[in-house]
Structure formats: C-alpha cells, structure tokens
Amino acid sequence: MTLSPYLQEVAKRRTFAIISHPDAGKTTITEKVLLFGQAIQTAGTVKGRGSNQHAKSDWMEMEKQRGISITTSVMQFPYHDCLVNLLDTPGHEDFSEDTYRTLTAVDCCLMVIDAAKGVEDRTRKLMEVTRLRDTPILTFMNKLDRDIRDPMELLDEVENELKIGCAPITWPIGCGKLFKGVYHLYKDETYLYQSGKGHTIQEVRIVKGLNNPDLDAAVGEDLAQQLRDELELVKGASNEFDKELFLAGEITPVFFGTALGNFGVDHMLDGLVEWAPAPMPRQTDTRTVEASEDKFTGFVFKIQANMDPKHRDRVAFMRVVSGKYEKGMKLRQVRTAKDVVISDALTFMAGDRSHVEEAYPGDILGLHNHGTIQIGDTFTQGEMMKFTGIPNFAPELFRRIRLKDPLKQKQLLKGLVQLSEEGAVQVFRPISNNDLIVGAVGVLQFDVVVSRLKSEYNVEAVYESVNVATARWVECADAKKFEEFKRKNESQLALDGGDNLAYIATSMVNLRLAQERYPDVQFHQTREH
C-alpha cells in the first residue's frame, strides 16, 4: 500500500530537542548537526575569542555576550530521506520554564552528557520532564577528545540515576590524546578518528570486523585488545537495543563521540532518523488528535519578543499536530473563538527567517503576534478543543522592580507584561499597592529582564529584594467563601500577567497557615496555559 503524498510528508518528519547540563556541549552538537544537515557551511565554535562568528543558534544581545543559548530557536534541515526539526532549548540552569514547554512540542530528545563528568543536576531535572510523556531518548556521550570516566561506569550512572536502560550502539576506543575512534556494535565496523577536522565533514576511515588485523594496525595492539575485552563485558552486562522499549522511553541507545571534533554526531543522527517516531498523537481536553488527520490543529508552546532587532515584533511558536498548513488559510483561535487568516507564517533556519507556503505535522510555525496570542493557545479549523499539558510553574525567586525614572511606569508595565506573556518571567501586581513583583525560576532571568527592558523598551530599572517566598494560584468553587478569603487576605493577593489571582506568601509557614485556614480554597503550584 502506498501512502498518500500527505502521509508521506508526515512520515518524513522528526522533531526533537537536545537536553543537557550547561557546558556539556549542546550548542556545539547543534552546530554539527546543522553541518551534517547542510544547513550551515562552516560551524562557528561557540566562544570564538574575538571572532565575530557566533554560534548560529545563539542570538539575543545577552546571549552574544555570555556565550549561552538563552532562547529556544527552531532549525529545520534535511537528513537522508527525512526532514528534521531541531528545537534548541536553553542550556543554562535558569531557563527551565521555557525549556520545559519546549519539551512538550517534541517527539524525541537527544540527551548530551559530558563523558568526563557524567550525569549532572540539570540533566536529571530535564529527564523528569520527559518522563511525564515517556518521550523517547537518545544519548550522546560527548567530549571523548578529553580524558573521560570509564564508559561502563557512565552507563551504570545513567541507568541508576535516570532510571532508563542503556543500549550502547557505538563504543569508544581510548580517549583524550589516545582517542582512536568508535566501534559500531550492530554493524561490526570501526570508525577511525582524525583530530583537527571539527569544522568540516570528514571522510572517515572504516575498518570492517572486530578481529580484522587492520584494526590492530590502525589503533595499536593494546587498544585493540582492550576494545575486544570491553566488548565482551558490554555484551554481557548491557541491554540490547529494542525499538519498542526505546519508543516507550524505557531504554536509550547510547553513542560516543566528540562534537568539537565533529566525530560520532552522524552515527547519532542515523539512529535518530531510523528509530525516532514520526509525529505523535496529542491529547486535548476532549479527544486524542492523530497526526494523520486531515484537518489542521496546532498549539503555541513559546512566545519570543523581538526575534528581529529590525522589526519590533513578537513571534509565537506553534507546533503543528495534524493537517497541512497552507498560506492564507483560516484558523480558529480556540481561546478567543475568533477566526484568523494566517498568510505570513515563518519557518526557521536559526536566525534566518523565511515565509512558509506549507507545513506538516511535526513542523514548527512562527506566527506574528501583536499581543493577541498566548502560550498554550490552540488553533484548529473550527473544532473547539484545547491541547493539554503545557505548564506554568510557580516561581521560586522574587524581586521588586523599581524604575529609575518614575515617569516611565506605563512603558515598564507594557514591557513586563510582554515579557511575561513570552514566559521569560512572571509578573505579579499586588492588589493593595503599586509595586511590581517579578517571579522567576532562576536568578539569571532577573538580569535578562533588566537588560531587555533597557534595550527593547528603553526603560532603566533595577531590581531589589522583596519579602516574598512563594506564590500559588488560587481558586474556589464557593463564591461566598472566596469573597471572604479575598477580603481578609487583600494585602497578600496579586494579579499575574494574565490577570489570574495569586496568593503571595511571605514564607512557607505563612502559606501553610493560609491553606489550613481556608480549606475550600485551592492553592495551585502550576497553572495550565
């Protein structure tokens, strides 16, 4: 049976994100993946000292200064017979909310681990999020051009700490200065490493067969024997790759390599297009939507302001779940129940924006947004339903924002509300005074807000500490009891950027007392968009 042209397009799509701890090499891997996808001609190393060639996926002013990818961008490139959408997630610890939401828009993740360090804190956190949806995970053990920990130990650590079985696909031969290449367990081939070829795709020399004398000649007898001994152990102690278990999120295929040396990345990409799922079904509040359906549906998982310094615009990122987008089609924005014609959607090659004529499930569209689109918005061809599972987290850190020039209050409020709609921070406006309290999941976000208020809204502001420990969104089925609660706690209530009522607690004890005193009021730690 031949698939219809539409289903062929759906089957070609692979949409994934990279998760890692800061500095495990995520941005470098992104570069090399794009190099293999022929999306960029030469890979820019991330912190080129004094060079102007910034990594292709880092592009806001502050990222340029700090050499980190703060905003999630989207890159599409062809690889073999597939079209791959790579969603870049911020690697720095603070940008978790944006990252969490990005993970709701992918069908698969690549976990990058620094093989000298093993499993780190941020990786654990991100893996917890992928667990919520049993997202399939591929693993890349990076930095083999440095001295690494024992590979068996690394696999054990992943299995014990992240509760996922490891199935090694390739195995390293030496490391650091002695790194010679990797052996492919399923093809019975050894790929030999040459250093210093990181910016180009190199012709790799292949030795077929583990017992081939050419292998001893190429890597030296000692390393060749060590490889054979290790593989005996590996075959006895580790999982075999099983595609069904991989798709269920129970085992992860593991690849070894060095992104900086541009070696091993293509083995991982081969695995990705061969095993990772085509676009998956998604849950709405009324039913499950399959990618094969012909009616268009999609949801917004991120909003980013000023992607283009030349245009003061904001772009909403929408994941296509089903149906085909065509230029000029009429879509219903479910939250407002309004129909909109979308004729200028964007597709992305990081930093370069081009208008798109059509898009399929798994693809990410950029919609121009003048403040009417919110995170979590569902678009359909008329059906009234909402995709679920796009979270907002209660912030853990709070600061008061104060203006240097009190006359700019209006611009400040506008800037903060726009930044909060984008999910960069959350804004709380206390009901009883004129303060503006900003909540974030990590400290770096406050610096980002102050620097963006200055560069994008021309507002000079500073932040100072405020007596707030945590916030909870509140609601109550009993209107009378809710009114009483609101009257008695007015000094601790605030509205967030979307005008939802929140309780601002000065300490965890204060929050507990309020919860005990008002058992009918619900205090929520997350809010669905």
From Swiss-Prot:
All residue ranges annotated as the tr-type G domain in the record: 11-280
Statement: the UniProt record of this protein carries the keyword Nucleotide-binding: yes
Pfam family name, one: RF3_C
Residues the entry annotates as binding GTP: 20-27, 88-92, 142-145
Gene Ontology biological process terms, A to Z: regulation of translational termination
Annotated compartments: Cytoplasm
Single GO MF annotation: GTP binding
Disulfide bridges in this chain: none
PROSITE patterns per UniProt: G_TR_1, G_TR_2
Residues spanning the signal sequence: none
Protein keywords: Cytoplasm, GTP-binding, Nucleotide-binding, Protein biosynthesis
One Gene Ontology CC term in the entry: cytosol
InterPro entries: EF-G-like_DII, EFG_III/V, G_TR_CS, P-loop_NTPase, PrfC, RF3_C, RF3_dom_3_sf, RF3_GTP-bd
Superkingdom, natural source: Bacteria
Function per UniProt: Increases the formation of ribosomal termination complexes and stimulates activities of RF-1 and RF-2. It binds guanine nucleotides and has strong preference for UGA stop codons. It may interact directly with the ribosome. The stimulation of RF-1 and RF-2 is significantly reduced by GTP and GDP, but not by GMP.
Alphabetized HAMAP family for the sequence: Rel_fac_3
Family: Belongs to the TRAFAC class translation factor GTPase superfamily. Classic translation factor GTPase family. PrfC subfamily.
UniProt name for this protein: Peptide chain release factor 3
Organism from which the protein derives: Escherichia coli O139:H28 (strain E24377A / ETEC)
